[in-house]
């Protein structure tokens, strides 16, 4: 849940408004006719802390449909996702990104690598994240408190 909404908050910074849909983390892809957590042009983004066989099957379907799957996961699971993709014959066809690098690269880019602007950029991402939580989830305790200094 947190992972998916942090990714959504980051995407909101760089994508035009309403260019992709944001769903509650408990909303399954199947019933909503989605190919992944985020569909942006021909890229399908999957957010998970536990990559598994079902996710790799979704990636296969993405590729068959002419779209490009990207898995965003936690650092400890990057190699798991890469190994699963390789075992399924998808090596080099599925991107796998560590969420911390995905987010921190954005913070550095949007702050123009100026340390004095980093907290402001991070605060913007967290504010967007908190709004997403309030709009899509029933548990407000998922919000993040951040005091930009």
Feature roles, as predicted:
Residues 2-149:
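Catalytic core segments in nucleotide and nucleic-acid processing enzymes
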């Amino acid at each position: 849940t947190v992972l998916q909404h942090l990714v959504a908050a980051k995407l909101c910074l760089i994508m035009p408004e309403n260019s992709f849909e944001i769903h509650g983390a408990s909303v399954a892809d199947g019933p909503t006719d989605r190919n992944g957590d985020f569909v942006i042009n021909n890229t399908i983004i999957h957010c998970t802390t536990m990559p598994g066989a079902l996710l790799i099957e979704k990636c296969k379907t993405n590729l068959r449909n002419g779209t490009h799957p990207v898995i965003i996961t936690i650092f400890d699971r990057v190699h798991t996702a890469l190994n699963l993709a390789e075992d399924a014959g998808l090596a080099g066809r599925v991107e796998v990104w560590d969420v911390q690098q995905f987010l921190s690269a954005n913070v550095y880019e949007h702050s123009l690598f100026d340390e004095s602007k980093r907290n402001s950029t991070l605060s913007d991402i967290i504010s967007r994240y908190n709004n997403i939580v309030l709009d899509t989830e029933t548990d407000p305790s998922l919000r993040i408190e951040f005091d930009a200094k």
